[in-house]
From Swiss-Prot:
The gene is thrB. It comes from Lactococcus lactis subsp. cremoris (strain SK11). Its main location: cytoplasm. It is an enzyme of class 2 (transferase). Belongs to the GHMP kinase family. Homoserine kinase subfamily. This is Homoserine kinase. GO terms for biological process: threonine biosynthetic process. It catalyses: L-homoserine + ATP = O-phospho-L-homoserine + ADP + H(+).
């Protein structure tokens, strides 16, 4: 059995902690065989546990505890990931969704998508990454009084270009630079920008969407000092035809929304700057969580 989960890119500027997209990088978890102990084969580095301390298995345990279910066996697993770690592309969220589905499959829980999303939000804290990892495409979500409401929609047609710096930026570090509160006037302005961003995405107006994502008042201006590449890439985007540029999740990945016919040009112009990192041309993943050879 294989569980496949896409990477995600959250916030899109003004959609802070609420809007996310699934993109074409993937985490794969394969169940190999029963084992005397849990064991995970991976090549993700020495800092990622290979036993029950791994986020995949702590998530599985949390789901089983929530459902008051025990597994009759432990398993040898293989985890492979194209998703860069601690770069703002939802690496932890993809593992959380995989862990929930692993519990769902092995314990035959028959969880609905809504139940999976509820569990994921309880573990992750907010829906902007876990929702598109689970559901694919563009997801706009909010959790109010413990209940997560979400809308899934087709993302406007365009290419995505992700610049992934070689340095990590932990979400907790990126959140430390945010203000504790906004004034009422600031909150109204930030909310209105987010409203227009949402409407423009849902009506396929990428020109307006790009303007609104770059006008964010919630987080990007506070985080910009942590990611020096953001402003440079935004300027390149303006000069060579990108719809918009935003900080993916908590960073440090910078994402550009690009007309398909400008992707090659923008890639070349960014590569000319010799930035330390990697460029990924990406597409929207419209499937979300996938299971091959389900145990059901």
């Amino acid at each position: 059995m294989k569980i496949i989960v896409p990477a995600t890119s959250a916030n899109l500027g003004a959609g802070f902690d609420s809007i996310g997209i699934a993109v074409s990088l993937y985490l794969t978890v394969e169940v190999l065989e029963e084992s005397s102990d849990w064991k995970i084969d991976h090549d993700l580095g020495e800092n990622i546990p290979t036993d029950e301390r791994n986020l995949l298995l702590t998530t599985l345990s949390a789901v089983l505890e929530d459902k008051n279910v025990a597994l009759p066996a432990k398993y040898h697993l293989k985890m492979t990931s194209e998703v860069p770690l601690a770069r703002g592309l939802g690496s932890s969220s993809s593992v959380i969704i995989a862990g929930i589905e692993l519990a769902n499959q092995l314990a035959k829980l028959n969880l609905t998508s809504d139940e999976k999303l509820k569990l994921a939000c309880e573990i992750e804290g907010h829906p902007d990454n876990v929702a598109p990892a689970l559901l694919g495409n563009l997801v706009i979500a909010s959790t109010v009084a413990g209940k997560t409401s979400h809308i899934v929609a087709d993302f406007p047609s365009c290419a995505l270009l992700a610049f992934v710096p070689d340095y990590e930026l932990k979400t907790v570090e990126s959140r430390q630079v945010l203000p504790n509160e906004l004034t009422y006037k600031e909150a109204v302005a930030a909310s209105s920008i987010a409203n227009v961003l949402t409407a423009s995405l849902l009506t396929n107006n990428l020109e307006v969407a790009g303007q609104m994502m770059e006008a964010d008042r919630f987080h990007e201006s506070y985080r910009a000092s942590l990611i020096p590449e953001l402003q440079l890439l935004r300027e390149i985007g303006h000069e060579f035809g990108a719809y918009g540029t935003y900080l993916s999740g908590a960073g440090p990945t910078v994402m550009l929304l690009v007309p398909d016919n400008k992707l090659t040009l923008l890639t070349e112009k960014i590569m000319e700057k010799n930035l330390t990192g990697h460029l990924y041309p990406l597409k929207i993943d419209n499937k979300g969580l996938q299971v091959e050879e389900s145990v059901f």
